[in-house]
């Protein structure tokens, strides 16, 4: 083999490699372009391609299983399938960003500021939800107090009735209406 044919094979293999195809898909459909970062981290540098391949393979396996499961359930679930694909891609993308940040900064101290902003936004949203839940809890306690205040102080004697229909005492039945004694 000559060196020109060997280099042309290398060029062909490089153009058909998974990372090149993946970068082309990201650039074509999502308009994202990211230059690969050159680092010299030793062991982490050697493990990075393997971890990325494992991430991609698991992404594709989960994507295949999810699409098959949704398709098997009903052919009309295209919207659910698209939602699943988008969600899975976002999870993959988030994992890739975290891994790239780890490669760029092995100490892990400086993740992106945008993630911190999202963290603060989600914390603010959690605080709002917590306040709403506390308000609902207080209203429920007030309603319980009103109900207890409205109940009569004396209880009826239902021991002579086979089935108790009043709310003041327990039914003599061993089971509720939802379960069977068998």
From Swiss-Prot:
Pfam family, one: TMCCDC2
Coiled-coil spans in chain: 124-151
Keywords, in A-Z order: Coiled coil, Membrane, Transmembrane, Transmembrane helix
Domain of life: Eukaryota
A GO term from the CC aspect: membrane
Membrane disposition: Single-pass membrane protein
Segments traversing the membrane: 51-71
Disulfide bond annotation, renumbered to this chain: none
Cellular location(s): Membrane
Subcellular location, principal: membrane
Protein name as it appears in the record: Transmembrane and coiled-coil domain-containing protein 2
Gene name in the database record: TMCO2
């Amino acid at each position: 083999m000559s060196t020109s044919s060997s280099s042309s094979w290398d060029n062909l293999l490089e153009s058909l490699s998974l990372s090149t195809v993946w970068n082309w898909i990201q650039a074509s459909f999502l308009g994202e372009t990211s230059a690969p970062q050159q680092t010299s981290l030793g062991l982490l540098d050697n493990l990075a391609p393997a971890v990325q391949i494992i991430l991609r393979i698991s992404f594709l396996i989960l994507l295949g299983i999810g699409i098959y499961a949704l398709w098997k359930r009903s052919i009309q679930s295209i919207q659910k399938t698209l939602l699943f694909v988008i969600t899975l891609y976002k999870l993959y993308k988030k994992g890739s960003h975290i891994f790239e940040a780890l490669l760029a900064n092995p100490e892990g101290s400086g993740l992106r500021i945008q993630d911190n902003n999202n963290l603060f936004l989600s914390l603010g949203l959690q605080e709002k939800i917590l306040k709403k839940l506390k308000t609902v809890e207080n209203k429920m306690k007030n309603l319980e107090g009103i109900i207890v205040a409205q109940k009569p102080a004396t209880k009826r004697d239902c021991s002579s009735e086979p089935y108790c229909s009043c709310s003041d005492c327990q039914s003599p039945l061993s089971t509720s209406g939802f379960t069977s004694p068998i």
